Amino acid sequence: MFEKPVVKTFQYGNHTVTLETGVMARQATAAVMATMDDTAVFVSVVGKKEAVVGQDFFPLTVNYQERTYAAGKIPGGFFKREGRPSEGETLIARLIDRPIRPLFPDGFTNEVQVIATVVSVNPDVQPDIISMIGTSAALAISGLPFNGPIGAARVGHIDGQLVLNPSEKELKQSRLDLVVAGTDNAVLMVESEAQILTEEEMLAAVVFGHDQQQAVIKAINEFAAEVATPAWEWVAPAENTELKAKVAALAETRLVEAYQITEKMARYDRIHEISAEVTAALLAENEALDTKEIHTIFHDLEKTVVRRSIIAGNPRIDGREKDMVRALDVRTGVLPRTHGSALFTRGETQALVTATLGTQRDAQIIDELTGEKKDHFLLHYNFPPYCVGETGFVGSPKRREIGHGRLAKRGIAAVMPSPEEFPYTVRVVSEITESNGSSSMASVCGSSLALMDAGVPIKASVAGIAMGLVKEENDFVVLSDILGDEDHLGDMDFKVAGTATGVTALQMDIKIEGITKEIMQIALNQAKGARLHILSVMDQAISAARSDISEFAPRIHTMKISVEKIKDVIGKGGAVIRQLTEETGTTIEIEDDGTIKIAATDGDQAKEAIRRIQEITAEVEVGVIYTGKVARLADFGAFVTILPGKDGLVHISQIADKRVEKVSDYLTEGQEVQVKVLEIDRQGRVRLSMKEAVETSDAAAAEVAPQAE
């Protein structure tokens, strides 16, 4: 029934990788089962043979989905099936998309969909790298006009050594988690998080990852040669040179003038005017012309005008030199009731960032294929339409917002205190209120400021900067603090976050080949200069965490009890701890090692909760006099509660120093009495005496009396 499947197996570092096609999804354009040491991802590619007429963009969709059966689990929830993509799935979909998108040719507008499904998971091998390798292999055998294949590698930094594709266990000891993807001669994408490494160490990791992944590219080329799928008969649309010349004649000089306008919205208005005038003039001349084609040519001309000006060494769109950072404005404590807040403005990009402190109970529980984990540091990024002067849908976060939020979080994570140092869950929210490039890096700066304003003891201030590149043949210019237009019209988007001493996050997206190690080195060094400048301005506003947290934030008090006493504090069915939290107005969390964390906005409430827990966990001591409450009467004596949950028996013979006929003649339930602990037997039963408590008290009073005279 099946033709002989094509299987390619190769060694990749410590892992064995297998690529297989020809058995499953034979109606798809291409499909590959990619396996790396029992982690298997099934990748399908479908490309439409016909493009939508008049479409001027490339409709590539990448879906990444994790199936719980891959880890031998059944999904939770009422419906017991997978739902919408998780944040982790969205981030990996972006990771696959970013390096493959620039490898499709300009003018190719056929719809392409990539679906990567995780079908088996080895907990020690993350599925992202093998998903990227599987996607590359599927595209390589699809026949689509794809200028690949790409390789992918994860790089760790352990004990001063670079490690290829570290295991989950190794990653916990690593100072670096870097993913790099590229072709045989170019790096295309970098995504990383680091524990404050130098620029040289980061660059070495990128180069190492790119060198190591050549084994993947070689194997995929051999795999594709064996499959031998015929290439699509796709020809790039012919360039309309006549229309191009007409648009240039009408618009070029005016566009050069328009790009002298430094204010973003005024510049956009002028460019739209020119576009409308050029379109109207050309349609008046020939009604048969395609408006979309005119707009595409006009946009290409814009790109040419800006790039040519930058390469020529002219001032940038907003009048800056290549290595200048826009004007900065830094404010902290801008919102009265939040736990921490900051407003960070860089040129026409602005972020309002808040920090909120919560208890361990507020931590996010993340249910991954490899197991459940808790995240005590959350960072959310919002990009509302008004920040770019537009109207639009406001709802759940889009892929871009999730990606930018994760990048900002990576930038800050290295300086966050450990849960032992600061036992709070921290949520940072960045609201982008204005945007003209590099809003994710503004979020990094604003987050650092808001955390310090909230009193979170972060290790150092963190700033982020976005770099750009314009390259024409052998000439290139690296730009610091790029505008949105420079990002859109340039060849590289290169974001670096870090402290004064090193890098905490690096993200690179490169649209062209030929970005050398030297160019990346120049960009990293230029980024360092810009970062240090921004940090100096931030430090003038706030250079260290405030000595105390906000009066509106919960204060967490920590105490330790014996592990055996945990059950006493919780009580049967949680009755004791529930009563404690309700009556004291606090939040109480108990850990397995006996650590108790009490959170309260009022200090007196916390003190009361601590006092009551100390009472519950206190040990009864022989010879000590306690003030107790009569809990129950019996014919042979009375049971008295001397500590919460601890009763003892006062035998009828120990109630008074004379004969007692009836217990109820001397005691009533609820009565407070003083009792002395006589004995605790092997079974933990407590024997009490009222008469000895009176005798001891009288003796103590007699000793004190002479001194009183």
Curated annotation (Swiss-Prot):
GO cellular component assignments: cytosol
EC number: 2.7.7.8
Residue ranges occupied by any KH domain in the UniProt entry: 554-613
Main location: cytoplasm
CDD domains: KH-I_PNPase (cd02393), RNase_PH_PNPase_1 (cd11363), RNase_PH_PNPase_2 (cd11364), S1_PNPase (cd04472)
Protein keywords: Cytoplasm, Magnesium, Metal-binding, Nucleotidyltransferase, RNA-binding, Transferase
Cofactor: Mg(2+)
Compartments where found: Cytoplasm
Oligomer status and interactors: Component of the RNA degradosome, which is a multiprotein complex involved in RNA processing and mRNA degradation.
Function: Involved in mRNA degradation. Catalyzes the phosphorolysis of single-stranded polyribonucleotides processively in the 3'- to 5'-direction.
Family designation: Belongs to the polyribonucleotide nucleotidyltransferase family.
Annotated protein name in UniProt: Polyribonucleotide nucleotidyltransferase
Organism: Vibrio cholerae serotype O1 (strain ATCC 39315 / El Tor Inaba N16961)
